[in-house]
């Protein structure tokens, strides 16, 4: 008789994805982030579900309902801070996962990569709408500023913004619909994750060398299940340390003030994981130009397979490209720092230089360097 896990229609899918999956034997810890992202999504959906049981999406009671969760609900404070800081862990894993893909040339799996970009946009939209829900000062003004960017779209912009708001300003209708979208989007993300995995398992995983690893595959279980569990323990340790020792470290103090449309906070800024894109947006004086730069700062990921000039897939054996990759990483840290600073000298010019450098490295320097490396190796 065939093994149950290999014969049952449902178990067969799980078996082929997580148990008997042939995996390259040399994948490093950078390949852990896929499973960590899955864990983050699970944590966010679970904690979010329990928060939604006590939250009210009304402008008059939203702020109070979050306070009520923290003060009166059993372990409500734990669920709330796990959800808020879980989002930060989610984005840390996302950035590292994308960085891994860029470094080792995983973007050559086009379908998997493109679904990944759609996933990134979906998760960013979810996080943005979630930030609006507590209805603090930064929630309200963040929602106002970011939705207002759509008014830069010619001809239909203003109508579009008012349609999204459900009125002439961010108000009750906006909060209610943002809650509805924030609730449904993670399930859409989960469905997209399935598609992401489906396409990945069509080709099999990449590996650090960037070479074909069909001759050296090992089963996913027990080798990588145990490796993923170690990663998961580290993730949970970091998350719980953050939640239990300094839950407000990554938050904004302004969000402990209830939303007031009549008083603008001195510095409106999004959560830390959007600051790099916010810095790029602000570095262009023109509104439409800024919005386009903001969108393309993420969409630029889609052109990576097209600008792969190097004969080698991975950067593992390409020291010049490695140097550029780490300069790009440092540039993103710089942009994140600038995004949190006020719009004044010298931050304006630093932000503009960092923005130009970001696009230049990807569009000009990386392809040029790949050409040079090919020539050096007489390819």
Curated annotation (Swiss-Prot):
This one is known as Cytochrome b
The positions annotated for binding heme b b566 are 97, 196
Cofactor(s), by name: heme b
Record note on cofactor = Binds 2 heme b groups non-covalently.
Family statement: Belongs to the cytochrome b family.
Protein localization: Mitochondrion inner membrane
Q: Which amino acid positions bind a ubiquinone, per UniProt?
A: 201
Which PANTHER family does UniProt cross-reference here? CYTOCHROME B
Q: Which InterPro entries does its entry note?
A: Cyt_b/b6_C, Cyt_b/b6_C_sf, Cyt_b/b6_N, Cytb/b6-like_sf, Cytochrome_b, Cytochrome_b_C_euk/bac, Cytochrome_b_N_euk/bac, Di-haem_cyt_TM
Q: How the protein assembles, per its UniProt entry?
A: The cytochrome bc1 complex contains 11 subunits: 3 respiratory subunits (MT-CYB, CYC1 and UQCRFS1), 2 core proteins (UQCRC1 and UQCRC2) and 6 low-molecular weight proteins (UQCRH/QCR6, UQCRB/QCR7, UQCRQ/QCR8, UQCR10/QCR9, UQCR11/QCR10 and a cleavage product of UQCRFS1). This cytochrome bc1 complex then forms a dimer.
What topology does it adopt in the membrane?
Multi-pass membrane protein
Primary residence: mitochondrion
Entry keywords, A to Z: Electron transport, Heme, Iron, Membrane, Metal-binding, Mitochondrion, Mitochondrion inner membrane, Respiratory chain, Transmembrane, Transmembrane helix, Transport, Ubiquinone
One GO biological process term: mitochondrial electron transport, ubiquinol to cytochrome c
Positions binding heme b b562 in this chain are 83, 182
Any Pfam family from its record, for instance, is Cytochrom_B_C
Record's miscellaneous remark: Heme 1 (or BL or b562) is low-potential and absorbs at about 562 nm, and heme 2 (or BH or b566) is high-potential and absorbs at about 566 nm.
Give the GO molecular function terms: metal ion binding; ubiquinol-cytochrome-c reductase activity
């Amino acid at each position: 008789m065939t093994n149950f896990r290999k014969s049952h229609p449902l178990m067969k899918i799980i078996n082929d994805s997580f148990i008997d999956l042939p995996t390259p034997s040399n994948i490093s810890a950078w390949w852990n982030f896929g499973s960590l992202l899955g864990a983050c999504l699970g944590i966010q959906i679970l904690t979010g579900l329990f928060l939604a049981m006590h939250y009210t999406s009304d402008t008059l009671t939203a702020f109070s309902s979050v306070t009520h969760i923290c003060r009166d609900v059993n372990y409500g404070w734990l669920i709330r801070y796990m959800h808020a800081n879980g989002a930060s862990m989610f984005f840390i894993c996302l950035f590292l996962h994308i960085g891994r893909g860029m470094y080792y040339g995983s973007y050559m799996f086009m379908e998997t990569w493109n679904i990944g970009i759609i996933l990134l946009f979906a998760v960013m939209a979810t996080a943005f709408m979630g930030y609006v829900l507590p209805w603090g000062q930064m929630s309200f003004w963040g929602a106002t500023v970011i939705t207002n960017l759509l008014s830069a779209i010619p001809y239909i912009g203003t109508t579009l913004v008012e349609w999204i708001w459900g009125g002439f300003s961010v108000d009750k209708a906006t909060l209610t619909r943002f809650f509805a979208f924030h609730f449904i989007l993670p399930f859409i993300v989960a469905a997209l994750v399935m598609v992401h995995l489906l396409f990945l398992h069509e080709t099999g995983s990449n590996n650090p060398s960037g070479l074909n690893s069909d001759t050296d595959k090992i089963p996913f279980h027990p080798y990588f299940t145990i490796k993923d569990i170690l990663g998961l323990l580290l993730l949970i340790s970091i998350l719980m340390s953050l939640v239990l020792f300094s839950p407000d470290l990554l938050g904004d103090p302004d969000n402990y003030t209830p939303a007031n449309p009549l008083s603008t906070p001195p510095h409106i800024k999004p959560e830390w994981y959007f600051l790099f894109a916010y810095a790029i947006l602000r570095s262009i004086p023109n509104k439409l130009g800024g919005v386009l730069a903001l969108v393309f700062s993420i969409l630029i990921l889609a052109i990576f397979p097209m600008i792969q000039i190097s004969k080698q897939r991975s950067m593992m054996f390409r020291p010049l490209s490695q140097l550029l990759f780490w300069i790009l990483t440092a540039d993103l840290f710089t942009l994140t720092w600038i995004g949190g600073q006020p719009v004044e000298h010298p931050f304006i010019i630093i932000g503009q230089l960092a923005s130009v450098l970001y696009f230049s490295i990807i569009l000009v320097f990386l392809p040029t360097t790949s050409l040079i490396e090919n020539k050096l190796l007489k390819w």
